């Protein structure tokens, strides 16, 4: 009976935190009122601020491009690992950037711009990290988000969204060429869309209101790049789902490098500035894919350390932290990764 009572109290607390409004009235998303509500909330654990990345809720929905696979899709497409054979001690703090300092890509923050390609960015970022990590620094390749969004038809609809797991399957089956940002213009197929600014003042142009269309698939490299398209491809050896278990996810990161994860984005997240995010208020907006690079504990609150794809001016220098170990916003339910072909 005691266990049931504790469960009911815990459930009530959870639901209360997820439907909280001011004076029982819905708070307008992206508004100053929502920002104030979050910053004044005693249990939020994070700070909100004004952002120009999203001009409206409809605008934000378009850019939330991570689609969820159902259980059958996951089961039929790739195995799920539980790492029961990995007997490694899990530290309270772990940062892939410090573990593998020779792999500079781990510290890199990309920008998907005005395109719902987060599913592709989370994938190529983690793949890029893993190429360096799993080769012991012997290989280095910045994989192209453009090649993935334009040529992987099974993945989804490019700038209109896609499946993170299928991106990893594509890496194994078809391979992905290299490609940096529009600004550095490196590799076979650099990203065609510019980095854009989240705030009124900054070093990048304003994000604007234009939503980019998915580029056509071109199996050629940019002019002046010497390696042919097919020869520039890098392949994975295996793609897999990571079991919905905090310790399994941690072990996978410790052994093989950052992973890609997708989570449910609520209205309050659109104003995230700093701290350890947990859902405080607002309805669901859509799905977003990111790269988990580590974890830690602050003031007894465990968190995931996460790299976003909205450039380094957003959040904590391009990163954010989210409560760990309770599947906050389903972030531990949709984790995918893979091994490189050696």
From Swiss-Prot:
Provenance organism: Schistosoma japonicum
Disulfide topology: 103-132, 115-159, 151-217, 152-155, 188-221, 196-207
Enzyme class: hydrolase
Active site: 118, 288, 308
Tissue: Intestine (gut).
MF (Gene Ontology): cysteine-type endopeptidase activity
Function: Thiol protease. Has a role as a digestive enzyme.
GO biological process terms on file: proteolysis
Prodomain residues: 18-89
Keyword RNA-binding: no
Membrane-crossing residue ranges in chain numbering: none
Domain of life: Eukaryota
Signal peptide start and end residues: 1-17
Protein name per UniProt: Cathepsin B-like cysteine proteinase
InterPro entries noted in UniProt: Papain-like_cys_pep_sf (IPR038765), Pept_asp_AS (IPR025661), Pept_cys_AS (IPR000169), Pept_his_AS (IPR025660), Peptidase_C1A (IPR013128), Peptidase_C1A_C (IPR000668), Propeptide_C1A (IPR012599)
Annotated SUPFAM superfamilies: Cysteine proteinases
Keywords, in A-Z order: Disulfide bond, Hydrolase, Protease, Signal, Thiol protease, Zymogen
